[in-house]
């Protein structure tokens, strides 16, 4: 296995002292990069992820180009769902489309047991290739969290208000519980397999869970998240687990009482406010990705975030959501250098 020579990200995730703020970006690998767009002329997303050499190349590009302190495996949160019997297609300009949506108990009952080594060996092979031969920074594996996966499975695709998902949850609580159990077992198994293959940390993407009230989260979602985290920690107690959601500041206190290591926040919450709500966790975030399209505003916001970030150990610079396709790679490199250089100066001053 390649030795990790840059462990800034891991030290920050453990709330240890660092000499500069670590940086990585959600969706740093992919659609904003010319090299990736050229690949997409020939291959679909799923075709790229099924070829370990190509997928590893895409995953590593941002490390080489931007100087980020962690790589995140290039794949989609939908990747494991075909292994459960879900017919999913990624449509350009739309996103994931489910051709056999979940609407009844019978639909839930038919979901297959997910076995990573059988269903997604190419994901594990990509991780092994990166960890063994290619990366000197930590590799982050990830999975979609059950609510977000269920929202796609029930709605049949992207949704603005998740009304089919929430009404299913309210109307069929017992069936919902079975669905959460199945998705939770899949997610835990999937994350453990990624760590076994060489991932240094894992992130749970619950992109749409902010649509729920805290009361609904506590009742319908918290039990399955606790189960996932508990099962991963039982096998890999020292591997950092990151929780990332959008528009979910009202749920931060829920995560404070779980054995998570890092909590991601978006631009709707300040780092100082987040630290008050999750004092035991490292914080990741929280630049609005839209500012990457307005360079002066981006650096202005970055400076403000740095000033907050250095106040306490346990901070990782990231976006509050993914990089947009229109963002110029040069901007990400410039921002990475700025975060590194500026935070190093400020931390030296004490």
Swiss-Prot record:
InterPro entries the UniProt entry points to: UROD/MetE-like_sf (IPR038071), Uroporphyrinogen_deCO2ase_HemE (IPR006361), Uroporphyrinogen_deCOase (IPR000257)
Root EC class: lyase
A molecular-function term among this protein's GO annotations: uroporphyrinogen decarboxylase activity
Entry keyword Lyase: yes
Stored Pfam families: URO-D
Record site: Transition state stabilizer: 76
Annotated pathway: Porphyrin-containing compound metabolism; protoporphyrin-IX biosynthesis; coproporphyrinogen-III from 5-aminolevulinate: step 4/4
Segment forming the signal sequence: none
GO BP annotations, alphabetical order: protoporphyrinogen IX biosynthetic process
Compartments where found: Cytoplasm
SUPFAM superfamilies: UROD/MetE-like (SSF51726)
Keywords: Cytoplasm, Decarboxylase, Lyase, Porphyrin biosynthesis
Catalytic reaction equation(s): uroporphyrinogen III + 4 H(+) = coproporphyrinogen III + 4 CO2
GO cellular component terms attached to this protein's record: cytosol
NCBIfam families xref list: hemE
Job description of the protein: Catalyzes the decarboxylation of four acetate groups of uroporphyrinogen-III to yield coproporphyrinogen-III.
Subunit composition and interactions: Homodimer.
UniProt record similarity statement: Belongs to the uroporphyrinogen decarboxylase family.
Protein name listed in UniProt: Uroporphyrinogen decarboxylase
Origin species: Listeria welshimeri serovar 6b (strain ATCC 35897 / DSM 20650 / CCUG 15529 / CIP 8149 / NCTC 11857 / SLCC 5334 / V8)
